[in-house]
UniProtKB/Swiss-Prot annotation:
It comes from the Bacteria. Residues 1-25 form the signal peptide. This is Sphingomyelinase C 2. Keywords: Hydrolase, Secreted, Signal. It comes from Leptospira interrogans serogroup Icterohaemorrhagiae serovar Lai (strain 56601). One of its GO terms (biological process) is symbiont-mediated disruption of host mitochondrion. It is an enzyme of class 3 (hydrolase). Residues 51-61, 67-80, 110-121 have a biased composition (Low complexity). Its main location: secreted.
C-alpha cells in the first residue's frame, strides 16, 4: 500500500492536470510526463533528506515564550534565568543571569503537539472498472481440491511490506530506505525461505540494494510490478504508462521461476493509490519438480479519500485475482498461494468477504497479534501514533487447488541488531509492517518468540529518595517527567538506547536516548524557554537530549537493581549536572537538571522488565 489508513498527500491538482493533458494530447505524453515530474519534484529537493517536513510543536507550554532554546542547541539566543521552580531561591550552579526572561508557565504540562493534518488530499474519484471479458468462471463441478501428501515437497513463503516509498513524496522523505534495505537483506528473518514477496518496494535505489544483496540465496527474481511491460512473459490488465509510481511488489525465489506475469488491476484504485500502477505478480515456481503458483499483491490502501475506505476497490481487485486464477487452468494437484498486504483488517466483515471472493481457506494464525502496530513499532508510531493496531497481511491457499494438511501464517516482529539513523531519526525497525511467514509445518528455523523485546526495553527508574518511579505524563505525550508513581505502570516504562553499542545486552555507562515505552518516539529532553520550568525534563517528539548520560555506580553491565545516576550537559553554562528529583513547592517530584554532586535525590534504581517475552511455540504445528 502507499499508505495505511491515509497516505502521503500528492499534489492532486497537478496530477489531474497531467492526466488531462495526456488524455487530450497522447502524442505528447512523454514530454508532459517529464515536464510534470520536474515541476513536482523540484520543490521537494531541499527537503529530500528530511524524515518528515511536518513541523510538530512539542515544547512545554509558555504563554509568551521569548526565543525558547532547545536542550540540544549550541547557542541560546535569549537565556532565561535558571531560577528555583518553586521560587525558593536555591543555590543554582547552572544559573548565570539574575534576570528572568519569561514568566513561569502554569504548573501544567508542555503544550500539546499540533501536527499538520496528515489526511490525504486526494479526491474521491474512482476510475470506472472496464469489463474483463478475458476471463471465464471455471466450472464449479471441477473444483474438488486434491490433498498433497505430507511426504511431498513443501513450500515456505515470506511476505513483508518494506515501506520504501518514493523518496520525493511530500512530507515523507526518505526514512532510511537504503539503510533499512541493507539491514533487511542481512537479517536472519529473510533466510531459509523458498519465496519472498516484498510490497512497497517503490524506491529504485533501496529495491536494488535489497534484491542484489539477496540474489545469492534467492537468484530468481521478478521486476517490480507496474514499472514496465518488458521483462514479463505477459503483461495483463490496465497498465497505465502515464502512472508516476510503480506498484511496489516484487517476488524473489530460491527455485527456478518458469513463468512470470504482471497484472495491473482494472480498478486503478482511489486516493493516493490511483497514481500507482498497482496490481499483482504471478509466478510459477519449480521446487524439486513440484510446481507452486504464487501471486504477490498489494491491494488498495484504506485511504480516507476513498469511498468507504476503499472497500469497493479492494473487492474489485480481489475479483481480478480470482478471475486470473480461473483463467490459468492450473492443475488441481498444484498449490496456489495468494500473498501480500491485502489491507483488510482480520476478522472484519470485509475480511470474510475477501475470504469468499478469493476462494481461500483461513490459515492457522500464530505469532504476534498484529502486522501493523503503532503501539510497538516506532516507524508506524512516527506517522500514525494514534491509530489502533491491525492485522493486514496474509498468505492464503486457494481452495480450488492442492491443499496441504495444515497451513500456518506466522506474524513476526524482528528488529535490527544495529540501529540506523537518517536526518536525526534513529530506529532499529525494519519497516512499519511486520513480516509474515506461510508454511505447512514449523521447523527449527521457525521463530518461536517475539523478536521485539530487548533487555533494556521497558525499564523503570525508582528514586532512592522517595521510593517512587519516574513516569511520563499519563495525560500528555509531551508532558513533564515526574518521580511520583507509587507502582510500575505503562507510563513508568522507558526504552534505553545506546547508539553504536555492539553489545546491546550490556550497557554500562555513556550517552543514551531514553524513550517512553508508552509514547514511542517521545524522548527525555529538558526545557529552556523561560519560567520556572527551565531545566525541567519532559518527553519531546523525535528529539532526545543528545548529551544525556547514564552512569552505573558499580561500573558493570546494567542489571535489575543497578544503582544509577543521570548526567546531562547545560548548553548555556557549558557544564554538566546531575538529574535530581525536586523536593519543594509546586514543582515537587519533577525531574530537573540541577545538581553538581550526588545525594539520594540523584540516585535511582534500575528495574528491568520482568514480563516474559511473548512465546508462541506451543501454538505451532510441527511434523
Amino acid at each position: 500500500m502507499i499508505n495505511k489508513i491515509t497516505k502521503p498527500k500528492l499534489l492532486i491538482g497537478y496530477y489531474l492536470l497531467l492526466f488531462s493533458l495526456i488524455r487530450c494530447l497522447p502524442e505528447k505524453e512523454s514530454s508532459y510526463k517529464d515536464l510534470f515530474t520536474s515541476l513536482l519534484f523540484l520543490p521537494n529537493q531541499t527537503n529530500s533528506n528530511q524524515v518528515n517536513s511536518v513541523s510538530i510543536n512539542n515544547d512545554p507550554a509558555n504563554p509568551n515564550p521569548v526565543n525558547p532554546a532547545s536542550a540540544n542547541n549550541n547557542q541560546v539566543n535569549a537565556v532565561p534565568e535558571n531560577d528555583d521552580p518553586a521560587n525558593l531561591n536555591p543555590v543554582n550552579p547552572a544559573s548565570a543571569n539574575s534576570n528572568q526572561v519569561n514568566a513561569a508557565p502554569e504548573n501544567g504540562s508542555p503544550a500539546d503537539p499540533n501536527p499538520a493534518n496528515l489526511a490525504s488530499a486526494n479526491n474521491n474519484q474512482v476510475n470506472a472498472v472496464p469489463a474483463n471479458n478475458y476471463f471465464t468462471k471455471e466450472d464449479s463441478s471441477n473444483n474438488i481440491p486434491k490433498k498433497v501428501n505430507s511426504k511431498n515437497v513443501e513450500i515456505k513463503v515470506l511476505s513483508h511490506n518494506v515501506f520504501m516509498l518514493p523518496t520525493n513524496l511530500p512530507r515523507w522523505g526518505n526514512l532510511g530506505h537504503d539503510e533499512r534495505a541493507k539491514r533487511i537483506s542481512k537479517s536472519d528473518y529473510v533466510k531459509n525461505q523458498d519465496v519472498i514477496v516484498f510490497e512497497e518496494a517503490f524506491d529504485t535505489s533501496a529495491r536494488k540494494i535489497l534484491l542484489d544483496n539477496l540474489r545469492e540465496e534467492y537468484p530468481y527474481q521478478t521486476d517490480v510490478v507496474g514499472r514496465t511491460k518488458k521483462n514479463w512473459d505477459a503483461s495483463l490488465g490496465n497498465f497505465r504508462s502515464y502512472s508516476l509510481v510503480n506498484g511496489g511488489v516484487v517476488i524473489l525465489s530460491k527455485w527456478p521461476i518458469e513463468e512470470k506475469i504482471q497484472y495491473i488491476f482494472n480498478d486503478s484504485g482511489c486516493g493516493a493509490d490511483w497514481f500507482a500502477n498497482k496490481g499483482f505478480v504471478y509466478v510459477k515456481i519449480n521446487k524439486e519438480g513440484k510446481k507452486f503458483h504464487v501471486i504477490g499483491t498489494h491491494a488498495q490502501s484504506q485511504d480516507q479519500n476513498c469511498s468507504n475506505l476503499g472497500i469497493p476497490n479492494r473487492a474489485n481487485q480481489f475479483d481480478d485475482i480470482r478471475n486470473f486464477i480461473y483463467s490459468k487452468n492450473i492443475p488441481k494437484d498444484e498449490t496456489v498461494l495468494i500473498v501480500g498486504d491485502l489491507n483488510v483488517i482480520k476478522e472484519s466483515n470485509e475480511y470474510y468477504d475477501m475470504i469468499s471472493r478469493l476462494n481461500v481457506n483461513e490459515p492457522r494464525y500464530v505469532g504476534v497479534p498484529f502486522t501493523w502496530d503503532a503501539k510497538t513499532n516506532e516507524i508506524a508510531a512516527y506517522y500514525y501514533e494514534n491509530e489502533e493496531p491491525v492485522y493486514l497481511d496474509y498468505i492464503f491457499v486457494s481452495k480450488s487447488h492442492a491443499q496441504p494438511p495444515v497451513w500456518q501464517n506466522l506474524a513476526y516482529d524482528p528488529v535490527s541488531k544495529q540501529t540506523w539513523t537518517v536526518s536525526g531519526y534513529t530506529s532499529d525497525e525494519f519497516s512499519d509492517h511486520y513480516p509474515i511467514y506461510g508454511f505447512v509445518y514449523a521447523d527449527p528455523s521457525t521463530p518461536t518468540k517475539s523478536g521485539h523485546k530487548k533487555k533494556y526495553d521497558q525499564v523503570s527508574f525508582q528514586s532512592a529518595a522517595n521510593g517512587k518511579y519516574i513516569q511520563a505524563d499519563p495525560n500528555r505525550k509531551n508532558g513533564w517527567l515526574k518521580a511520583d508513581a507509587v507502582i510500575e505502570t505503562d507510563f513508568t516504562k522507558f526504552n534505553l538506547l545506546q547508539e553504536g553499542n555492539l553489545n546491546p545486552s550490556c550497557i554500562k555507562n555513556g550517552l543514551v536516548r531514553i524513550e517512553s515505552s508508552r509514547f514511542l518516539n517521545y524522548f527525555w529532553n529538558w526545557w529552556l524557554g523561560g519560567g520556572s520550568g527551565n531545566y525541567g525534563y519532559y518527553s519531546k517528539f523525535n528529539d532526545a537530549s543528545n548529551q544525556l548520560e547514564i552512569i552505573n555506580l558499580s561500573d558493570e553491565c546494567l542489571e535489575n537493581g543497578s544503582k544509577i545516576v543521570f548526567k546531562d550537559y547545560d548548553t548555556y553554562s557549558r557544564n554538566h549536572y546531575y538529574l535530581t528529583v525536586w523536593d519543594k513547592g509546586n514543582w515537587n517530584e519533577h525531574l530537573y537538571l540541577w545538581k553538581d554532586s550526588i545525594s539520594q535525590r540523584e540516585i535511582f534504581y534500575l528495574k528491568l522488565n520482568s514480563t516474559p517475552v511473548r512465546n508462541w511455540s506451543a501454538d505451532l504445528i510441527y511434523r
